[in-house]
Each structure stands twice: as C-alpha cells, then as structure tokens.
Amino acid sequence: MKPPILIIIMSTVMSGTMIVLTSSHWLLTWIGFEMNMLAIIPILMKNHTPRATEASTKYFLTQATASMLLMMGIIINLMFSGEWTISKIPNPIASGLVTIALTMKLGMAPFHFWVPEVTQGISLSSGMILLTWQKIAPLSVLYQISPSINPKLLITMAIASVLIGGWGGLNQTQLRKILAYSSIAHMGWMTVILTYNPTLMVLNLTIYITMTLSTFMLFMHNSSTTTLSLSNTWNKLPLMTSLILMLMMSLGGLPPLSGFAPKWMIIQELTKNDMIILPTFMAITALLNLYFYMRLSYSTALTMFPSVNNMKMKWQFESAKKIILLPPLIIISTMLLPMTPMMSILE
C-alpha cells in the first residue's frame, strides 16, 4: 500500500474512533463506528492473500451485524425516551441490544468466533491495530452507558469470555491466535468491573493495550508467527526473546509484573461489593491463560530446538532494529506493579 493512501486510511480510522470518544449523540457515535469499520478493511486486506480477504469479509459481516443491532437499540431508545443522548437508556430492551452490539464489536463471548480467525488471517501489524485500537471505541460507549447496563447480562458474558479466552488458547501453536484468545479473556476482565467501578476498566484497558503493543512489536521485530519460530529466536536475539517471555508472563497476570495489578484491583473491588464467588471463579479461570503462557515460555526458553551443530549460541548476533516506542512500552508492561498504591487513588 502506498504511503499517502495508508496515511489517509489510518487518519480515517483514528477519526472514527475520536468521533465515538467525543460525541454524546447516538447518531454521531454510530457514524464514527461506521467510519472506523469501513476504513480498517483495507488495512486488514493489505497482504492481498485469500486468507486476508476471508478474514476481512468475516470482520465486515460481524461488524455490520453489530452496527445493525446498535442502530436498532438506538431507535428503540429514541421511541421510548425521545432523546439522542448516550447516557440515558431507560428501556431494558434498548439497553440489552446496545450491550450485545458493543460486545459483538469487542469480540466477547458468545460472539467471539470471529476474533481468532480474523487475527490469524491478517498480518502482525494489522492484528496489532485490531486487538488494541479497535477496542477503544466500543469500550468508551460501554463506559458512558454503564449506569443503564443490566449487570447480570454483562457479568455472564464476561465470565464466558474469560473461560473461552483461557480454554481456546490451550492447544494453539499460532502466536496471533494465542493473543486473540488472550484479548477475549482481557475483555471479560474489563467488562466484569464496568458496572461497579468504570475507572478500573479504563486502567485495565491502558495496561492491556501497552502490553499487547509491546508483544506485537517484538513479534514483528523477530518475524515470529508460530511457537516454533519463536523457539528459534533465542540464539539470534537473546535479549528480545527474554523480553517477549516477560511480556507473556505479564499478559498472563503473573506477579510481580504489570499484568497482575489490574486483576488484583478488580478482585479487590468485587470483594468490596460483597461478591466472593465471582472473583474466586475469575481468579481460577485466569490460571488457564497463565498456563498456556507459562508453557510457551518453557518451550521457548528452557528447551533447545534440535540442531546439527553443537553450538548453543550464534557467534554473531543479529543487529537489533531501533524501535523508539519499545523501551517505554516494555517498562510500563513489566514494571508497573510498584505503582499500584498510586493507581488505587483512581478508585
């Protein structure tokens, strides 16, 4: 794709999200979603492979269905309330339709089937945009309508997302699918706390985006797409490989890394609201994600790939490309836990 065209498309994607973030009118929000969806399709298809075309078609059909449900919910809300403002959804049917539409856009269970397939069919750079930037707009609308959402519906979908995000990643060898299932699980953690403390959802989203951006950048740097290719990188780029392993542990929520902080604060907030069974169940299901990240780290760092020569390390390492954003992203992704007492001020 030529740079001028890419700049125009990327600016449209960003403009669509910014319209959703800044508008308090339902029609403008819907227009922002449509701008964002139509502009992201060429980015997903930039490889011009049959798999990328299939992934883009799946994404388009899912997002179009979600947009239709969203518009239906908006119209029902307009019929009953007579208002276009986002913050007020007095009708439970309209609230349910809007919630389902937004969770479908996020790829939460039971509307999660498109996320692994689409992520696997596109390039690493497109997958990075899909699993980070594309989550901001739907979550911002959920944040605004959180007082009107049915908590039981959202908690049920959140629990299903955490379960499926853990189970789905267990037998995967493709790194993009592993990150897609991890994204589904993280969406479950974000939405379970939404009706109790929306600020914690924003904090969780920020840490999730930082960790996922760092992981995708390192995968692009190493050209790693499978667990096998990742296990071959340690003797070429040992520092990068060790950073990837730390980021994976952080994504799994292992203390004392950054990914543990939002889970800790969410469990604490749920227990403050006299909920014991839900945070216990969420903590147990989070072990599924941690397990497949631990297994991936073990196969990468602690086992050697069969080789004909006896040399463990290459005599000359590959020169690392300079990525300006990577050092601060890695620091935030792995060393944010000591800042948790300061984060608790947000509550």
Curated annotation (Swiss-Prot):
It is found in: Mitochondrion inner membrane. The chain crosses the membrane at residues 3-23, 25-45, 60-80, 96-116, 122-142, 153-173, 178-198, 200-220, 237-257, 274-294, 323-343. Its EC number is 7.1.1.2. InterPro entries: Complex_I_Subunit_2, NADH_DH_su2_C, NADH_UbQ_OxRdtase_chain2, ND/Mrp_TM. Keywords: Electron transport, Membrane, Mitochondrion, Mitochondrion inner membrane, NAD, Respiratory chain, Translocase, Transmembrane, Transmembrane helix, Transport, Ubiquinone. GO terms for cellular component: mitochondrial inner membrane. It catalyses: a ubiquinone + NADH + 5 H(+)(in) = a ubiquinol + NAD(+) + 4 H(+)(out). GO terms for biological process: mitochondrial electron transport, NADH to ubiquinone. Signal peptide: none annotated. GO terms for molecular function: NADH dehydrogenase (ubiquinone) activity. It is a multi-pass membrane protein. It comes from the Eukaryota. Disulfide bonds: none annotated. Pfam families: NADH_dehy_S2_C, Proton_antipo_M. The keyword tRNA-binding does not apply. Core subunit of respiratory chain NADH dehydrogenase (Complex I) which is composed of 45 different subunits. Interacts with TMEM242. Belongs to the complex I subunit 2 family. Core subunit of the mitochondrial membrane respiratory chain NADH dehydrogenase (Complex I) which catalyzes electron transfer from NADH through the respiratory chain, using ubiquinone as an electron acceptor. Essential for the catalytic activity and assembly of complex I. This is NADH-ubiquinone oxidoreductase chain 2. It comes from Phoca vitulina. The gene is MT-ND2.
